[in-house]
């Protein structure tokens, strides 16, 4: 336990009630890790932390899961944390599971497309999973395994981030 307090730089002579929200999160994590669990279930564990401490916590998580008998299940709105350490991602929106996939498979499944609204109306929609309109442009997800030959100088296709995939699927019209 003391090892985790020191590693997470938790002040040991400050009453818990006087600690910052970030230090309270870290002390809860230290208590959980000190019990040598096989499974950590965490809710928004990195949300109250500054970027430097968040990075330290993520490194600690990576060390924890190097032992293949151990796992972490955590919810997060910080998708960059998921990109750094997740093996599997489950996206739940408004109580519905939208997907549950291996992170690498998820990132290889789609292309993110961006074009003008007028151009989108003329595109073949085969392979387009979802889209949303944003001012004068349309942002869409293209299932890369199906593809549809969407290549045009007026259409930008790029590798999406997890956040972009989630945004289009949550905000967009599903085809």
Segments predicted by a language model, with ranges:
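ABC transporter nucleotide-binding domains
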Residues: 1-73, 79-80, 84-87, 93
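Conserved protein kinase catalytic domain
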Residues: 5, 58, 107, 166-167
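Alpha-helix C-terminal capping segments
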Residues: 5-10, 113-115, 120-125, 146-151
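Alpha-helix boundary/capping residues
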Residues: 8, 110-113, 169-173
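Peripheral/terminal regions associated with large enzymatic or DNA-binding modules
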Residues: 40-42, 102, 125, 168
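ABC transporter nucleotide-binding domain
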Residues: 58-142
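C-terminal coupling/interaction segments
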Residues: 129-175
């Amino acid at each position: 336990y003391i090892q985790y307090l020191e590693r997470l730089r938790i002040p040991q002579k400050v009453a818990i009630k006087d600690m910052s929200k970030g230090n309270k999160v870290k002390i809860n994590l230290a208590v959980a890790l000190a019990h040598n669990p096989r499974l950590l279930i965490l809710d928004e564990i990195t949300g109250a932390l500054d970027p430097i401490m968040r990075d330290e916590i993520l490194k600690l998580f990576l060390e924890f899961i190097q032992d293949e008998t151990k796992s972490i299940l955590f919810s997060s709105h910080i998708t960059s944390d998921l990109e750094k350490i997740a093996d599997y991602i489950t996206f739940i929106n408004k109580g519905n599971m939208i997907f549950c996939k291996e992170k690498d498979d998820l990132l290889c499944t789609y292309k993110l497309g961006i074009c003008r609204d007028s151009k989108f109306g003329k595109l073949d929609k085969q392979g387009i999973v979802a889209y949303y309109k944003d001012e004068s442009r349309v942002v869409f997800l293209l299932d890369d395994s199906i593809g549809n030959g969407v290549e045009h100088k007026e259409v930008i296709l790029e590798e999406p981030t997890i956040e972009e995939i989630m945004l289009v699927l949550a905000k967009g019209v599903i085809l």
